[in-house]
């Protein structure tokens, strides 16, 4: 696929035609640092020891011109990344911050910047289908494939309680 765009994948880094460099780093907090630039984290709600990785890797995007972007299928509310998603990481123990309300889910469905400076955007399968994905996805077939809890997590962007999780995160990190 990459060859169609004149890009050779070598396992190191990729330099795009506009000069941008893509580096693929591990999710190991001891090795996923040291560069600067935009940070993109994929499937962060499934990364073990996310808190430590977030602390060190997000520093790569310290300059104002860089941003940190995390995207993921939700997992359990007990996952460390959920504290970043719901704002509790930012609130910490600060009484003033603990009193700050975050936007409702309806606002996040159109995208919004939250009090912690993080842009949150929820895209459920229903919105994607309404936006044109219907040419590639039969939503009723997908709904029929899963039980309601699993569908809500995988396609409805809903976090589940650990007891209802499709995959028990604590078992995955053993």
Question: What do the PLM-derived regions correspond to, one by one?
Answer:
Residues 11-19, 73-79, 125-132:
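Short, conserved secondary-structure transition motifs
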Residues 39-41:
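Walker B beta-strand of ABC/ABC-like P-loop ATPase nucleotide-binding domains
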Residues 31, 47-48, 76-82, 129-131, ...:
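Flexible loop/turn segments at secondary-structure boundaries
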Residues 1-37:
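Inter-Walker segment of RecA-like/P-loop motor cores
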Residues 13-15, 29-31, 58-62, 109-115, ...:
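A general structural signal for short secondary-structure junctions and capping/turn motifs
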Residues 112-174:
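ATPase catalytic-site recognition across NTP-hydrolyzing enzymes
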Residues 44-118:
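Signature of the SF2 helicase/ATPase Hel1-core->accessory helical subdomain module
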């Amino acid at each position: 696929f990459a060859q169609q765009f004149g890009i050779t994948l070598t396992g190191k880094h990729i330099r795009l035609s506009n000069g941008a460099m893509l580096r693929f780093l591990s999710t190991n907090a001891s090795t996923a640092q040291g560069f600067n630039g935009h940070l993109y984290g994929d499937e962060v709600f499934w990364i073990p020891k996310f808190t430590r990785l977030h602390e060190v890797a997000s520093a790569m995007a310290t300059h104002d011109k860089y941003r940190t972007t995390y995207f993921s299928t939700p997992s359990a509310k007990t996952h460390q990344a959920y504290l970043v998603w719901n704002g509790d990481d930012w609130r910490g123990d600060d009484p003033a911050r603990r009193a700050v309300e975050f936007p409702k889910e309806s606002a996040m469905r159109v995208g919004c910047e939250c009090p912690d400076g993080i842009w949150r955007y929820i895209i459920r399968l229903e919105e994607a289908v309404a936006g044109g994905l219907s040419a590639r996805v039969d939503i009723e077939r997908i709904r029929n494939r899963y039980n309601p809890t699993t569908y809500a997590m995988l396609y409805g962007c809903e976090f589940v309680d650990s007891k209802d999780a499709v995959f028990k995160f604590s078992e995955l990190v053993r």
